[in-house]
């Protein structure tokens, strides 16, 4: 008999440890592990972590087997793992109905349960009696299902189970926008059952999605039907959100030790090594103690001050837990494993020694990891005053299975029984490795031979869609429909993937479906859904953005292949040539670089060997599911009745005689978007007619309605000041209008009448033939829409079934070809069109911690969006907030999409912005146009609505960045029926705060430091971003800013003159922009938190921000910043809001003084008013007229709004004096004195 080797003896010791501390809790029937001998429930997350030691030990035995008994032991341990994983699978499959519901609702009530009965796999508490929604737990299951399958274990047995796992992928793929209860099952740290977006859940979901993508769940015994598919765009969403959140854990937790699981083993979800290190150092500096790490700051769990009789905490109670949070040894096991993966022997040794010192010795000397260490009740005050000095006592479960398992696993790794690659066979540990540069393959395809010839004339040789047969080309939306079939299973009543937009990562792969190769054009080229794709310059801009996105985010083997179609809509108006923007783009693509992205232009056939392929075998003919199925819930398209069909309906029909089911299905989808031509052509004779411009009709009807109600309603609602906006605006939706009023309007507008004196709708339909412009036709259709409704059959030209809606849809297409953007937006509103990606765009902004408001302030007219909403609900909210002004509702959707583009591509634009107020942004855009065009607010509003999407996006960028911009007027072609001249936006040079202004701010710092003795001037008072240039152009457009005073000058007591004319309106504009987009100085919220600790509260516009908020929230919490923001947002005027922010910044300098308390409530409004009075007094004393123009709403002088922050007449000078005067009695004798 062979002697046992040393390694064998050591492994036997670990086997006894595993048996006595983990496997003794495993149920022999279900395989689930109970939490302890007393707690019989099985938590999903704890079970998976607890079995990892068994999995690792099984692999160690297999690798180091001395004899047959060792191989048998390895098999036994591995089957214990399989039994547990299948037990969890059984628990979840019993809740298959919840998985199906959750895909659509993402509601906490429809989530899988977090814990189950160990003996029966059944649920143990009700849906609403526990924080069940824990995306990280479900994701952890999928992650280790993938890792264990890759390691050789067979866990999934049938195709039904494969379909269920595929649906679990759909369950977690929206993790980037799902607020859940997180690792600690508490949600918001007040433990009041409030879910929140957790970085740990997003990161674990990202890891799981990446790990299980293209994995065969049957392992070596599988085929293509058992492969799981993940859409790469969903993974990238998670990556983007994770990057924006870390090192913050959630809105209520500025840091959480649970993040160790996503920055290192097991998830390795973060790709930026710097971000990993920053997060790790934050955990160590803020959470680490002598016995482990706290879970998060102010965690009351099992502390002596926690009330055991209730689960929730009162908000002000959280400060009681400061410095006495329990410390968890389990986190040190993460640090040990992290050190092993990173090859950091010092870190491994340090944490091993620390952990050995706090392990509990059990029976027979076995080492046990306790759940946590707590402060003894009689030592609480001592620890609070001197953190990390009191000896703690172990509490909770012993052993803590999660911690015990990771301790054993770390020991096996440290002793060399396991290699890191064995517990990470999918190589997630290389996530931070440098990736090779991505080259994007671009193939340009002509829609037909005519376009191909036009391109050839310019020396551009491309293939047409017919040329590349047998490769099939389809619009991206078809791929969304196809993916809706993935994961469908009749046996379990699973519908498959919900119909969702598929991003450019998904459309840049080649697909093999029924042995045919398919390529899909990106969705931004698809005119089927929204009007952005009707603007060729916008398409080119989106191509540039998407190519850069592909270069940054592509993670798959092979190169991305983007198919860019050149369609008839990309021609000039007469169809004789290619649009210049499209042609110049193709030339840039030929150069090999476009917008910073490396590209290779070529024919599709050249890219077949270097592209990435996905095999969609779930559509194979031998599959049980049929493509045409009444029960295909997932394949419903929200825009299936749209007018602009695919450009490829006929292509395949020309090259094949017989069609299989797939071809019929695709053609069915394409034909559902095709509309016939019903509208008569425009009349060429320019004679008098009874119709009028759509914009004027709207204005006249609105005006008459308002007069009938006794109201004076301005037509230009987006121009400042806000007070002029009427709450009664309902400009375009007259469906609910009283009929007598409508009759009076129609009578006055001379429409054709019938015998009874009512509008003769049949004659009105006939007048469509006499219209000379599309806007005239729109007016007629609008009146028909109001009087008869969208479903009324016009019987135009004797054809039945031609409804008002059909005609509006057709008119929308014609307006798109003519590029009449005001009309396009107007008809889009009537048709209630919505951007298909609206919900995703909104979720993107929210996930980047940017709340949204739609409509104009104040509440309740301004609606806040603080959590993702279903598309229909979101659209309805926007229309409601727009006061039924459908043009504004449509523009709001457009702005949300652009903001989402920018927050992904240029997140730096949104620094220190927490809430994006779309209504105010639109208002400021109109005001900026009025300023630049030197026109009235009404003309500016009209010009704004007529901007092309490309120019609208550029204007928004200038608003966000603070850059100066220019406006060019260009008359439309003679054949265009638009009523207003076209304008375009362009940049005017580099702009920025001048050197003098910067030095002025620095000088002001030193002045204030002298005045306050102990004031700190480390931070800048006013955020210096790019501002208005002093170019000659800028001077000319600034000479008559709509809301600015006329140019004047005055001198100070020393004879120095203030020149208002040269840079007039600059700082007013700056404050208006920053106030509208809610930008605040860096570190603003943390400074507010400090000042609140020294007073009873801040009063802003009659609302008090109490000091008690600091007892609940810590300074770095997003939740605190949002709370401050909600108080500031009660101020409806953006420039006044910004002055309040400046006043608060001056006040926060007091937080750096040694004073314990300032006293009562500080009235910030009074400080601003006092500063304004000081300013006025000095202006009058130096010879300025005593009738200096003031803002009627606030009483603030326009010159004060337009003063730079620094300098003798700067706002900061007066605000500092006002603060000193306001608080003089409370300051120490050596403090501020009014100068």
Swiss-Prot record:
Tissue and organ expression note: Predominantly expressed in liver and other non-muscle tissues.
Pathway named in the protein's UniProt entry: Glycan biosynthesis; glycogen metabolism
Subcellular location: Cell membrane
Transmembrane segments: none
Gene Ontology cellular-component terms listed: phosphorylase kinase complex; plasma membrane
Ranges for region Calmodulin-binding: 808-838, 1059-1099
Domain of life assignment: Eukaryota
Presence of keyword Membrane: yes
PANTHER family: PHOSPHORYLASE B KINASE REGULATORY SUBUNIT, PHOSPHORYLASE B KINASE REGULATORY SUBUNIT ALPHA, LIVER ISOFORM
Known partners and oligomeric status: Hexadecamer of 4 heterotetramers, each composed of alpha, beta, gamma, and delta subunits. Alpha (PHKA1 or PHKA2) and beta (PHKB) are regulatory subunits, gamma (PHKG1 or PHKG2) is the catalytic subunit, and delta is calmodulin.
Protein name per UniProt: Phosphorylase b kinase regulatory subunit alpha, liver isoform
Species whose genome carries this gene: Oryctolagus cuniculus (Rabbit)
Gene: PHKA2
């Amino acid at each position: 008999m062979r002697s046992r080797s040393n390694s064998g003896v050591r492994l036997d010791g670990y086997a006894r440890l595993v048996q006595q501390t983990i496997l003794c809790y495993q149920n022999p029937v279900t395989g689930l592990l109970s939490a302890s001998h007393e707690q019989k429930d099985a938590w999903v997350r704890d079970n998976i972590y607890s079995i990892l030691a068994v999995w690792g030990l099984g692999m160690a035995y297999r690798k180091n087997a001395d004899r047959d008994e060792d191989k048998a032991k390895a098999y036994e341990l591995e089957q214990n793992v399989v039994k547990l994983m299948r037990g969890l699978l059984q628990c979840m499959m019993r809740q298959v109905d919840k998985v199906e519901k959750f895909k659509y609702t993402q509601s906490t009530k429809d989530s899988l349960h977090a814990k189950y009965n160990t003996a029966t796999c059944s649920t143990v508490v009700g849906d609403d009696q526990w924080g069940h929604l824990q995306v990280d737990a479900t994701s952890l299951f999928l992650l280790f299902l993938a890792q264990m399958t890759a390691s050789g274990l067979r866990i999934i047995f049938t195709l039904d189970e494969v379909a269920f796992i595929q649906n679990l992928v759909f369950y977690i793929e929206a993790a980037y926008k799902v607020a859940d209860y997180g690792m600690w099952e508490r949600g918001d740290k007040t433990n009041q059952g409030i879910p929140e977006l957790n970085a740990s859940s997003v990161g674990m979901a990202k890891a799981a999605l990446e790990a299980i993508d293209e994995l065969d769940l049957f392992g070596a015994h599988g085929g293509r039907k058992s492969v799981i598919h993940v859409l790469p765009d969903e993974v990238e969403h998670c990556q983007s959100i994770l990057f924006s959140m870390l090192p913050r854990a959630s809105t209520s937790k500025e840091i959480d030790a649970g993040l160790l699981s996503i920055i290192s083993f097991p998830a390795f979800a973060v790709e930026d090594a710097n971000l990993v290190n920053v997060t790790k150092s934050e955990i160590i500096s803020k959470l680490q103690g002598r016995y482990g790490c706290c879970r998060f700051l102010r965690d009351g769990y099992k502390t002596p001050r926690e009330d055991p009789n209730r689960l929730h905490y009162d908000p002000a109670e959280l400060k009681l837990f400061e410095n006495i949070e329990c410390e968890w040894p389990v986190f040190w096991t993460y640090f040990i494993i992290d050190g092993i993966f990173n090859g950091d022997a010092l870190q491994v040794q340090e944490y091993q020694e620390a952990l050995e010192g706090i392990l509990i010795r059990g029976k027979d000397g076995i080492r046990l990891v306790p759940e946590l260490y707590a402060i003894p009740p009689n030592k609480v005050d001592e620890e609070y005053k001197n953190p990390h000095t009191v000896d703690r006592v172990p509490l909770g479960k012993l052993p803590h299975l999660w911690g015990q398992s990771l301790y054993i696993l770390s020991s096996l790794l440290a002793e060399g029984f396991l290699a890191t690659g064995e517990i990470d066979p999918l190589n997630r540990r290389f996530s931070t490795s440098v990736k090779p540069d991505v080259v994007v393959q671009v193939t340009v395809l002509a829609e037909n031979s005519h376009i191909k010839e036009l391109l050839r004339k310019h020396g551009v040789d491309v293939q047409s869609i017919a040329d590349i047969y047998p490769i099939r080309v389809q619009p991206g939306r078809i791929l969304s429909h196809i993916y809706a079939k993935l994961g469908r299973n009749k046996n379990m009543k699973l519908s498959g993937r919900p119909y969702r937009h598929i991003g450019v990562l998904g459309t840049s792969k080649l697909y093999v479906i029924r042995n045919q190769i398919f390529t899909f054009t990106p969705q931004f080229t698809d005119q089927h859904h929204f009007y952005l794709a009707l603007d060729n310059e916008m398409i080119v801009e989106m191509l540039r953005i998407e190519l850069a996105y592909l270069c940054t985010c592509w993670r798959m083997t092979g190169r991305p292949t983007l198919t860019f179609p050149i369609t008839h809509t990309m021609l000039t108006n007469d169809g004789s040539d290619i649009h210049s923007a499209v042609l110049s783009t193709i030339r840039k693509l030929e150069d090999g670089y476009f917008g910073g992205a490396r590209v290779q232009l070529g024919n599709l056939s050249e890219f077949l060997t270097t592209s990435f392929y996905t095999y969609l075998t779930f559509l194979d003919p031998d599959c049980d599911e049929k493509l045409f199925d009444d029960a295909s819930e997932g394949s419903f398209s929200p825009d299936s009745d749209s007018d602009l069909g695919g450009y490829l309906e006929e292509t395949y029909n020309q090259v094949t005689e017989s069609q299989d089911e797939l071809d019929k299905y695709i053609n069915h989808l394409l034909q559902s978007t095709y509309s016939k031509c019903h509208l008569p052509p425009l009349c060429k004779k320019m004679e008098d007619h009874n119709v009028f411009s759509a914009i004027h009709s709207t204005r006249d009807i609105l005006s008459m309605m308002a007069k009938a109600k006794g109201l004076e309603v301005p037509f230009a609602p987006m121009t400042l000041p806000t007070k002029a906006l009427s709450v009664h605006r309902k400009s375009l939706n007259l469906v609910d209008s009283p009929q007598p009023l409508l009759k009076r309007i129609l009578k006055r507008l001379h429409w054709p009448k019938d015998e009874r004196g009512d509008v003769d709708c049949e004659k009105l339909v006939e007048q469509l033939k006499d219209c000379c412009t599309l806007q005239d036709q729109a007016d007629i259709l609008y009146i028909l829409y109001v009087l008869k409704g969208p479903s009324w059959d016009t019987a135009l030209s004797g054809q039945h079934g031609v409804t008002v809606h059909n005609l509006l849809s057709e008119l929308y297409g014609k307006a798109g070809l003519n590029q009449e953007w005001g009309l396009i937006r107007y008809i889009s509103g009537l048709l209630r069109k919505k951007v298909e990606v609206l919900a995703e765009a909104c979720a993107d902004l929210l996930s980047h911690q940017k709340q949204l408001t739609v409509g104009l302030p104040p509440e309740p007219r301004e609606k806040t969006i603080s959590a993702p909403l279903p598309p229909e609900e979101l659209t309805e909210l926007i229309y409601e907030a727009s006061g039924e002004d459908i043009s504004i509702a449509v523009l709001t959707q457009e702005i949300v999409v652009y903001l989402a583009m920018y927050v992904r591509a240029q997140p730096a634009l949104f620094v220190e912005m927490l809430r994006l107020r779309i209504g105010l942004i639109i208002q400021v855009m109109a005001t900026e146009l009025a300023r630049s065009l030197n026109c009235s607010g009404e003309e500016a509003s009209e010009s704004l609505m007529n901007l092309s999407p490309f120019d609208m996006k550029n204007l928004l960028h200038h608003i966000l960045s603070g850059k100066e911009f220019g406006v060019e007027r260009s008359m439309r072609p003679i054949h265009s029926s638009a009523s207003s001249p076209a304008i375009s936006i362009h940049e005017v040079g580099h702009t920025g705060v001048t050197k003098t202004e910067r030095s002025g701010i620095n000088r002001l710092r030193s002045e204030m430091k002298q005045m306050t003795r102990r004031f700190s001037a480390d931070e800048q008072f006013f955020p210096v971003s790019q501002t208005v240039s002093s170019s000659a152009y800028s001077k000319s457009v600034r000479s008559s800013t709509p809301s600015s005073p006329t140019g004047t000058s005055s001198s100070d007591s020393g004879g120095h003159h203030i020149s208002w004319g040269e840079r007039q309106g600059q700082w007013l504009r700056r404050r208006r922009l920053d106030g509208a987009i809610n930008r605040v100085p860096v570190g603003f919220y943390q400074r507010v938190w400090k000042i609140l600790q020294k007073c009873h509260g801040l009063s802003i516009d009659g609302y008090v921000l109490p000091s008690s908020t600091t007892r609940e929230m810590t300074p770095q919490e997003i939740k605190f910043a949002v709370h401050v923001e909600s108080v500031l947002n009660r101020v409806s005027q953006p420039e006044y809001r910004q002055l309040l922010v400046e006043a608060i910044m001056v006040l926060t300098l007091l937080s750096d003084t040694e004073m314990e308390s300032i006293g009562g409530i500080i009235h910030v409004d009074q400080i601003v008013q006092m500063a304004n009075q000081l300013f006025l007094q000095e202006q009058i004393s130096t010879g300025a007229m005593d009738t200096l123009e003031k803002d009627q709403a606030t009483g603030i002088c326009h010159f004060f709004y337009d003063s730079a922050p620094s300098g003798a007449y700067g706002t900061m000078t007066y605000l500092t004096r006002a603060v000193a005067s306001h608080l003089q009695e409370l300051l120490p004798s050596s403090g501020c004195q009014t100068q």
